[in-house]
Structure formats: C-alpha cells, structure tokens
C-alpha cells in the first residue's frame, strides 16, 4: 500500500474508536490525580492503569519515579512507553498525568471526577488537560498496531507527573536524572495547548512569574479601627497599584497570543473568620506572563517600588516571594522538522493551515527548549482547562488522534 493508502486506513480505524476513547476517559477521570501541592494524592493510580493499558498494546513501559514523601508510596510516576520503529530516532508525545483541583464544586453541573457524556461532549476534570493528549496518543499507537505498520521512527509516549505545579517531579526530573532519553534530532510534541480549530502550533512562551504578597498590619476589633492597621484595605490598594506593571511593561508582539504581557491578581488566602475583626495579615498572589523582551528581574524591581509606596501610605509591611520564576527559553524554530510534520498532518486531517505562534501560558515544552530540544505544543484545544465543567469534543479527540497517527507513519 502507498503511504496515502496506509494513512487512509489509519483514519478509518481511528474513527471507530469513539467508545474506546470514552471508556478510557472514564477510567482516567475517576482516578483523581491532583498533586500534593494542591492537597491531592498524586498520580500513582492513574499511572498504574495506563501502564497496564500500554503493556497490553505491546509497548515497552518503564517508570522513572521521582521521590516525593508527600504522596502515598513516596514516589511520583513518570512513564516512558516505546514502540520500536525502523530507526532509533524517535517521535515523542509528552502528556501529563496530573490535574488541577475541581475548584468551586457548586459551579459544576455534574460530578467533576465522574465522566459525563452529552452527545459529542465529554465533561470531567482533566478530560482536556491533559487526558486529551494521553488518549489521542495511545489510540494513535493502537491504530498502528492494528494495521501492522512499522513506523520509520521509534514512537515514544511520555506520561509525566507534576506539570500543574512546576514539573520538578515530572519532566524536569527526567531531564536532570535521565537526559539520555531525549535527543536533539527527536521530534517532540506536547499536546497541552492550542486553539479549537487546531491551527495554533505553540513554539514560544512568555516568561512566567508568580508572586506571593504578605501584608502585615495590626488586628483589632472592627468597631475600633483606629487601634489597628487594616491589611485588607492595604492589600486592595496594592492590587490596584500593581496595575502600573501593565503600563510599564507595555510592549506588543503580535506573534504572541495575547500580544502583550499580563499581570493578574488571582488567589487570596483566608484571613479572619469573623466579620467584626479587622485583619492584621493579608496574603494574595499575582500571576505575571511577561513577553521575552523583558527581564523578570526588572519586573520584580518595579514590584518592589510599588510595594514600598504602599507600605508608606498604609503603614504596613509587605514582603514579596517569587513562588515560580521562569525566564522564557529560546523559541523552537518555526521551520523545525516537528513543526513541519504537524503542519502536514493538520492539513491532511483538517484541511487547515496550522501556524507557529507564541502563547502566554506555560507548558512543559519550556523545559525541553531550555535543554536545546525543539518541542512543539499542539492540540485542538476546547479552552476549558482549569474551568468548571471542563470538556472535550469527541470529534476533536478523534481528529487529533489522526493527526498524531499521520506524524507517526509519515515522518522519517
């Protein structure tokens, strides 16, 4: 059969996997894989299920666990599954096992940790982020197995822990302790971001800075405010003052989506429990996604300038801590082989032109790029990650599986 005929056969087989994909999503959703940083049990149960499924397909599976005494068993799983090709050069698809917490349960229409199917839509925590990548890549390999095709490159599936809280127990651990797994001429695909049309190939990310602000004042009875220093009021004014960051670091780069830096207040920690007490301690967080043209040290210097002004104005003490600080690595070249392979595959499946772009969100691809490994992030993304009622369209899941199958069987 010709390569085109082989791919047509793969597409037909994958189109018949609808129920199988639903069944796997169901098994993944109910195995809660929230990490210990978010008071969860970790990824062990999900990894054990997937390791068994991969071995059932005949793949060689090895676990490279990262020590972590915060989870049962004391380890975070990192699975590597290989399907031998005609050469040792590899095509990698890296997905992550962990999910974020459910958030406000009242905003969910159904149980977040039980799959709900409504027509072509699948609902549940993790169905998109990142079960989409897990399911699409596994069923692409399954289709190859059913057709008996041997790919030119060896296919590697990496299922890693800890993506949602920094990757130190996941990909960062693998790259530090097992750098031999990945090579510069490998094609590395990370299905963890994109747009609904599947036309965005992410090759660059903004720098990421998460800041924790601790505001200290003096607690007192709310009827005697002159006896205290209200940290809630000081925090509110500080949050508003931090809007100066967007004015200071105001460059626009259309290559990125969105094209400007963002500085968003997000989490607030609980202070006092009762209404009639003025809080003497306030803690809030700022999520900064900064265009690579800026150095994060300059952003932090501006933050210190703003907080110093707020300290003087409100008679409080403000300490700032960088919870996460990642200066953007060099971008993957727009003409890299992995980008070209994805463009050809997207065109073949969706009849659309996928373009390389930069994004504001952080993905594990940054760790690859920092090691000089050109990775591309791509998926047909429903844009519901981290939201209540997270969902994925089954047709997009099937289509993306076909895209990965095209890369597997057509790339040399």
Regions found by a protein language model. Give the residues of each.
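Structural motif
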Residues: 89-92, 121, 156, 186-188, ...
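Acidic/His- and Gly-rich active-site-bordering loop/insert found
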Residues: 2-123, 146-151
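Metal-dependent amide/peptide-bond hydrolase catalytic core
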Residues: 1-9, 16, 193-198, 203, ...
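Glycine/serine-rich anion-binding loops at beta->alpha junctions
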Residues: 120-135, 221
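Acidic/histidine-rich catalytic neighborhood of metal-dependent amide-processing enzymes
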Residues: 130-204, 412
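Short beta-strand segments
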Residues: 94-96, 158-160, 189-192, 216, ...
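Short, solvent-exposed loop/turn segments at the edges of secondary structure
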Residues: 76, 110, 184, 206-208, ...
């Amino acid at each position: 059969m010709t390569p085109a005929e082989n791919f047509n056969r793969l597409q037909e087989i994958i189109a018949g996997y609808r129920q199988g994909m639903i069944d796997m999503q169901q098994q993944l959703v109910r195995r809660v894989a929230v990490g210990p940083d978010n008071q969860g049990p970790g990824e062990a149960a999900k990894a054990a299920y997937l390791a068994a499924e991969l071995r059932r397909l005949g793949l060689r599976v090895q676990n490279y666990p990262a020590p972590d005494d915060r989870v049962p068993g004391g380890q975070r799983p990192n699975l590597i599954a290989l399907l031998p090709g005609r050469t040792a050069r590899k095509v990698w698809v890296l997905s992550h096992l962990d999910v974020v917490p459910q958030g406000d349960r009242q905003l969910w229409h159904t149980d977040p940790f039980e799959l709900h199917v409504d027509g072509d839509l699948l609902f549940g925590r993790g169905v998109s982020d990142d079960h989409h990548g897990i399911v699409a890549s596994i069923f692409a390999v399954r289709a190859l197995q059913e057709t008996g095709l041997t790919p030119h490159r060896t296919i590697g599936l990496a299922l890693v822990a800890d993506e949602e809280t920094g990757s130190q127990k996941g990909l960062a651990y693998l790259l530090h302790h097992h750098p031999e797994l990945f090579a510069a001429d490998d094609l590395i695909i990370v299905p963890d971001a994109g747009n609904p049309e599947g036309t965005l190939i992410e090759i660059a990310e903004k720098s990421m800075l998460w800041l924790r602000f601790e505001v200290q004042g003096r607690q007192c009875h709310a009827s005697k405010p002159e006896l205290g220093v209200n940290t809630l009021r000081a925090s509110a004014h500080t949050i508003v003052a931090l809007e100066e960051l967007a004015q200071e670091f105001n460059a626009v780069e259309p290559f990125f989506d969105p094209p400007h830096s963002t500085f968003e207040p997000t989490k607030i920690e609980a202070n006092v429990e009762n209404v009639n007490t003025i809080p003497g301690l306030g803690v809030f967080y700022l999520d900064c996604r900064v265009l690579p043209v800026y150095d994060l040290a300059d952003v932090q210097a501006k933050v210190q300038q703003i907080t110093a002004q707020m300290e003087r104005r409100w008679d409080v003490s403000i300490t700032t801590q960088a919870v996460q600080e990642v200066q953007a690595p060099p971008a993957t070249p727009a003409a890299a082989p992995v980008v070209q392979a994805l463009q050809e595959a997207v065109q073949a499946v969706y009849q659309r032109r996928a373009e390389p772009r930069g994004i504001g969100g952080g993905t594990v691809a940054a760790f690859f790029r920092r090691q000089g490994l050109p990775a591309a992030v791509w998926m047909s993304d429903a844009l519901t990650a981290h939201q209540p009622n997270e969902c994925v369209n089954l047709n997009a899941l099937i289509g993306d599986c076909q895209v990965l199958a095209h890369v597997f069987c057509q790339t040399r």
